[in-house]
């Protein structure tokens, strides 16, 4: 078992036993907070519909346990009263934990309080750079990883033997 969820298998072996599609260093962000220009699609989507980009990230970071639609609606509702950052910053913390990323450029709640769109874009790019495509959802990513016989990029440090 991996955490509380199932072990993902490809031809009888656990994904934990397979190499990563791309070995990216833990402890380093692959993209900066203000590097929105690196992915125009994510940038435009987040500028127009931040709740959609955020919800896609939530589904991946939480390994499909929080449906995209639910996360998006909650983010949208909280956005109307200016509090979406309260729901968003814990997801950034989870993402950082998965990849042992530093809390930069400041505390997660401050990043989301003062720059939610930039934070959402950075988190989307980080997932994409590490092999997860937030736009296709968790199950489609799992199917893709199974076909390619690679380890899912979502790994909690200390959980692998």
From Swiss-Prot:
GO terms for cellular component: membrane. It is found in: Membrane. It comes from the Eukaryota. It is a single-pass membrane protein. Pfam families: PLAC8. The chain crosses the membrane at residues 71-89. Keywords: Membrane, Transmembrane, Transmembrane helix. Belongs to the cornifelin family. May be involved in heavy metals transport. This is Protein PLANT CADMIUM RESISTANCE 12. It comes from Arabidopsis thaliana (Mouse-ear cress).
């Amino acid at each position: 078992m991996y955490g509380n969820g199932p072990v993902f298998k490809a031809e009888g072996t656990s994904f934990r036993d397979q190499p990563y599609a791309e070995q990216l260093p833990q402890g380093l962000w692959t993209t900066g907070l203000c590097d929105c220009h690196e992915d125009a699609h994510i940038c435009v989507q987040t500028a127009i519909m931040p709740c959609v980009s955020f919800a896609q990230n939530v589904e991946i970071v939480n390994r499909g346990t929080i449906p995209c639609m639910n996360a998006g609606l909650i983010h949208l509702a909280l956005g109307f009263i200016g509090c979406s950052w309260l729901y968003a910053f814990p997801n950034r913390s989870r993402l950082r934990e998965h990849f042992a990323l530093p809390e930069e450029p400041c505390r997660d709640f401050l990043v989301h309080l003062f720059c939610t769109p930039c934070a959402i874009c950075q988190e989307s790019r980080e997932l994409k750079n590490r092999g997860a495509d937030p736009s296709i959802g968790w199950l489609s990513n799992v199917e893709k990883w199974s076909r390619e016989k690679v380890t899912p990029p979502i790994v909690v440090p200390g959980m692998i033997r």
